[in-house]
Design a protein with these regions (language model features):
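Interdomain "pre-motor" coupling segment immediately N-terminal to P-loop NTPase/helicase cores
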Residues: 2-43
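Walker A/P-loop nucleotide-binding motif
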Residues: 86-103
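Conserved nucleotide-sensing/catalytic segment adjacent to the nucleotide-binding pocket
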Residues: 131-178
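Loop/turn-to-beta-strand initiation segments
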Residues: 88, 116-117, 150-153
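Pre-Walker A (pre-P-loop) alpha-helix and adjacent loop at the N terminus of AAA/AAA+ ATPase modules
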Residues: 45-90
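Post-Walker A helix-loop "phosphate-sensing" segment adjacent to the P-loop in P-loop NTPases
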Residues: 86, 109-119
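Short beta-strand-centered segment that lines the nucleotide-binding/catalytic pocket of NTP-utilizing
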Residues: 115-129
Length: 178
């Protein structure tokens, strides 16, 4: 008796990954992403534009917060759709409470659902792990350090709120360029 009758638990059908193997990968990367629970709530299905004002315009862009949110969601979908073909970075910035983390989680969920590996850390968590791996030679931190550089997408939340020093600057530069 096989768990998957299609591939007979080999994980492959005609040299290609079976749906069961792909799902196992997705389950594993979700478990490693640090955001599994929150993605049940924070995803594109639950994204609401009615939170954003259509009236108040940003004097620099001339766009309302509603239009800015629409543009940001569009850019996120472009990023997701082109993820395999055009590797690039996304940077969300703005005031507290405008939806940056929510939108980041929407992107993370879509990529995780497509089998990509995504790891989420706050800036503080990221630099703490990196410093433990470098200075304390902590084995768990070293393993996580490697995952940071091997993942398909690294999400760094609240970047700019941490204490900036030469170590955090050099490590951020290393993460972004790897």
């Amino acid at each position: 008796v096989y768990t998957c009758p299609d591939c007979k638990d080999s994980g492959y059908i005609d040299g290609k990954k079976c749906h069961c193997f792909k799902q196992a990968i997705i389950n594993t990367v979700y478990a490693q992403s640090n955001i599994r629970q929150i993605l049940r709530i924070e995803n594109f299905d639950n994204f609401r534009y009615d939170f954003y004002s259509k009236e108040e315009k940003n004097p620099l862009t001339g766009l309302s917060s509603y239009e800015t949110a629409q543009k940001a969601v569009r850019e996120c979908h472009y990023f997701i759709d082109d993820f395999d073909h055009k590797p690039k970075n996304l940077l969300f910035y703005g005031k507290t409470g405008v939806g940056k983390t929510f939108l980041t989680n929407c992107v993370a969920k879509e990529l995780l659902d497509h089998g990509y590996s995504v790891i989420y850390f706050t800036a503080f968590q990221l630099f703490d792990i990196l410093s433990k791996g470098v200075f304390e030679k902590d084995s768990d931190a070293i393993a996580t350090h490697q995952n940071i550089f091997d993942c398909d997408l690294l999400v760094i939340d609240d970047l700019g709120t941490e204490l900036i020093n030469s170590f955090t600057s050099s490590q951020l530069f290393l993460c972004v360029n790897e």
